[in-house]
Amino acid sequence: MIYHSKKYLNDPRGFTLVELIVVVIIIGLLAGLVLPQFIRQEEKAKLRTTKAQIELFGTALDTFRLDVGRYPTTDEGLQALRQKPGGLERWDGPYLRKDLPLDPWSKPYAYRSPGEHGPYDIVSYGADGTPGGDGDNRDITSWEK
């Protein structure tokens, strides 16, 4: 059994300044350890999402090519997977169930056909939306697996 004096239980002062500072320091240390891990996991999740979306585009583009006999031109863009471009008799889309997704940084994907690296190139320019960069700003492409 734990014995407490009435004087201690009725003390209205609460926590001392030193105790509060110690608690704040401990919370700060824990946040300093957890936050970088969380940020790295978020970056990895965005990378995986972008690669999955590019693969989805690739599957839809291949189906488009099987129906039409070619990939959409750069001018037709990825929108040709959702809306029939003019003059295509054998278009049997839409080839995507939903509207074209933006990349995880809320920017549109870049599409070129013919591409420099294959029949088409699809690129997400990362967080900064410009070519090149490292980390969150790096480009994620259809030709790099």
What are these regions (language model features)?
Residues M1-F15:
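N-terminal leader/signal peptides at the extreme start of proteins
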Residues K7, R40, K44, T63-D67:
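Conserved amphipathic alpha-helical interaction elements at protein-protein interfaces in regulatory
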Residues P12-F38:
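N-terminal single-pass transmembrane signal-anchor helix
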Residues T16, Q41, T73:
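Ser/Thr-glycine-rich phosphate-binding loops at phosphate-binding pockets of nucleotides
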Residues I26, T49-A52, T73:
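A generic short alpha-helical patch detector that favors 3-5-residue windows
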Residues Q37-L56:
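Aliphatic-rich helix starts adjacent to a transmembrane/signal segment
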Residues E55, T59-K145:
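Low-complexity, acidic interaction segments enriched in glycine
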